Amino acid sequence: MSTFAVLLLCVQACLIQNVYSQCLGRVGPGGPPLGPYGGPLGGPGYGPVGYGGCGGYGGSGIGNVAVAGELPVAGSTGVMGQVPVIGAVEFAGPACAVGSVSISGACGPTCGCGGSPYY
């Protein structure tokens, strides 16, 4: 195998170990004389204080973000070219906008000739 392939294999092994390993932050030295100053592997790492161990990385959910309050946004945005929107665009609640919108060209999913949609 080439040197680059071996290096790539080692990097992948480190990444896999990082993903599937246990968080052992603040694990101190072991042994009977140093027992109160460090915890066993996987235990609380703050000695006799008794803080909980680290949890694994992971998350689940839909990914919605709720924003409450006023968000003063100022500025202008210029969009040139084609902006395809596939799917649904939805606003819930009052969405006040000040300014102007100009739409020109072929609107809707057409082939560009103003005919019937291509789907």
UniProtKB/Swiss-Prot annotation:
GO biological process terms on file: chorion-containing eggshell formation
The keyword Repeat appears for this protein: yes
Region (Right arm): 104-119
Stretch list, region Central domain: 56-103
Assigned keywords, A-Z: Repeat, Signal
InterPro entries per the UniProt record, alphabetical: Chorion
Left arm: region residues: 22-55
Signal peptide start and end residues: 1-21
Pfam families assigned to the protein according to its UniProt record, in alphabetical order: Chorion_1
Any one Gene Ontology molecular-function term assigned to this protein's record: structural constituent of egg chorion
Transmembrane segments: none
Family, per entry: Belongs to the chorion protein family.
Protein name: Chorion class CA protein ERA.1
The organism of origin for this protein: Bombyx mori
